[in-house]
């Protein structure tokens, strides 16, 4: 009887340890997938790959500029941004993020990061600020449904690539 209790106790302890170990691994895996989705979106802008950009966003996703006299700009459809990106010739804008901070709760995530934007063929930073990406996890993985961004032209520091 004592050996049965010991075995049961060991099995329960192993099961609990497995669950506890799996949770951080899953969270870390989700965090990597979130950063990867945002990176793919920005890579799509730089390479003008509209298919790559579309693969990272949900239908109806929006961009909301934050700042200016009213504090909040008019939202614009990310589909429109993708279309304009695809119509350009040559490389697209080079938007880079640094030290992303990811927060996850169930199927909702945010990624907050400092960004710089450099125009094609230029080395000078055109503008910088903070991007906040909101993502949802669905059957097809993590997808962007909204981007909020501040933007300024002064006080920008370079991101080491």
Segments from the language model and where they lie:
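Short beta-strand edge/turn micro-motifs at domain boundaries
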Residues: 128-158
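Cleavable N-terminal signal peptides
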Residues: 14-15, 25
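Bacterial N-terminal signal peptides that target proteins for export
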Residues: 1-12
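Surface-exposed, charged secondary-structure patches
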Residues: 28, 62, 76-123
């Amino acid at each position: 009887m004592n050996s049965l209790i010991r075995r049961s106790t060991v099995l329960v302890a192993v099961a609990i340890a497995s669950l506890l170990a799996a949770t951080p691994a899953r969270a870390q895996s989700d965090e990597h997938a979130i950063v990867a989705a945002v990176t793919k979106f920005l890579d799509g802008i730089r390479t003008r790959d509209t298919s790559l950009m579309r693969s990272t966003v949900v239908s109806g996703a929006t961009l909301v500029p934050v700042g200016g006299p009213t504090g909040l700009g008019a939202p614009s459809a990310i589909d429109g941004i993708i279309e304009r990106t695809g119509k350009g010739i040559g490389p697209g804008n080079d938007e880079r993020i640094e030290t992303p901070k990811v927060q996850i709760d169930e199927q909702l995530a945010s990624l907050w990061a400092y960004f710089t934007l450099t125009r094609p063929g230029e080395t000078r930073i055109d503008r910088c600020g903070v991007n906040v990406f909101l993502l949802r996890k669905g059957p097809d993985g993590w997808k962007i449904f909204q981007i909020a961004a501040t933007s300024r032209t002064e006080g920008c520091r370079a991101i080491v690539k």
